[in-house]
C-alpha cells in the first residue's frame, strides 16, 4: 500500500477538479487510454529516464498532479520487470488526491504534499531535501511543471534538485510552454490557446458587469490571480542557466505534439483551469463562454499555420541533467 500524505476533509468540488484533470489526460478516465498529447509527451520523458533506472532506484516525480507521468513511468518499469521506490510530490490537494486514489494500492509509492501551513496560517513550499528526509534520489523527473515555477524561484529549486540527487543522479524534465530558439514556426506553445481564451473573455460583457461590482483593489487582485493560471512563457535558457550554475550538465531534446481540439476543450474546462473565465459562474455560463472563446482561439492558431481544424501543434522541450 502507498504511504505518506493522505487527503483529509477534501470537498466534493476538489474531488471533481481532480477527476476532471485526470480525464483531460486519460480518455473517460481509463489509464489504459491516455489522450494523444499526454501519451506522446510523457512517452519521450519516460524513455529519457529509463536508462537511468534500475531495480531499487529511488525516483522522485516533482509536480505529480493527478499522477499522469508517474502512471506512464510505472507502466514502463513494470513492462521491464524493474521495481522502484517512487515518491510523488505536489502542492495541489485536489489533483494530488486523485493521484493518491489511483496509486494507493501500489507498494513502494510514497506521497508528499509540498506545501505547509505555519501557526499563523501562512502557506509555504517545503524544501525537497526535507520531503525526502535526507535520502538521495537516483532520478528526479518533472513533467509539465517547470514553466509554472516563477523565474525568481528557479535558481533555488535547481539547488534543491542538486542537493537531493546521488552523485551519479539525473534530473529529467519536460515542458510544452517554454520559449526556445528551436521552436518550429508551425508550432505553438502548450498554453497559447488558453491564454488567448483569457484575453478574449477579458472584456466579456457579463464578466465586465460582475467586475464593476467590485472595488478597484478587488478587481486588481482578482485579475492578477487569473493571469497566474496560465502565466506568460519565459525562455528555457532560464532553467538551463540555473541548473548549470549549480553543477548540472545539460542535454536537450524537443518534439512537436498534436493536441486535438476535443482534448483542448476538456483541458480548458477543468474547474481549476476554467477559473480564467471568473467571475462568470461555474457551470453552463462559464463553460459556454470558454467553448466559444476557445473555438476562436484555435481557429486563429490554425490560421497562423500552427494547427489545423482538428488540432494545434504544441512544441515540447526536454532536459536531461547530470551532476558533475
Regions picked out by a protein language model, each given a short descriptive name:
Residues 123-140:
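A short acidic, Gly/Pro-enriched loop at the edge of an enzyme's catalytic core
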Residues 1-54, 68-72, 76, 172-210:
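Conserved class I S-adenosyl-L-methionine
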Residues 24, 28-29, 251-305:
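C-terminal helical/coil "lid" or tail adjacent to the Rossmann-like core of SAM-dependent
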